[in-house]
Amino acid sequence: MITLEKGITRAGTGYAGKTWNILGQLYFPKAVTDSTFAFETNSEPGQFVPVHVHPTQDEFILVQEGVLDLKLDGVWVKAHAGDLVRMPRGIPHGCFNKSDKPARALFWVSPMQKLEALFNMLDNLADPAEVVRISAEHEVNFLPPEAND
């Protein structure tokens, strides 16, 4: 069982000094417990996470800087700094930085399930097909590429 430790995870750093590079995007874990997993992302212009589904987790995004284009259950929407995006489990969603400026956001899922283990395995992995395969083993299912249109 993973319990929450008191303290502060500083801006631009990850919990316990950890950082993941997942296909060029930097992820910083902020809080890790059995019930919740929170992480910060920094997305450069053009970076994205393709449409996928978390069948066993609810997910949230608090946009902290910039604008994110999201495809939520087949519909395109924009989230600006200060906006909170709510994504119930089972809803297809993808996150895209289509702007010409960096975006920063705090993501969290509940419960954690296998997401931290997945990010540990994806760190510095360069093959997108392998990312998709490993993700499916950790309860994150990517949709076919046309779902991103």
Language-model regions: role of each:
Residues 56-58, 62-68, 73:
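Glycine- and acidic-residue-biased ligand/ion/polar-headgroup-sensing regions
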Residues 23-24, 39-54:
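Conserved short histidine dyad/triad with adjacent acidic residue
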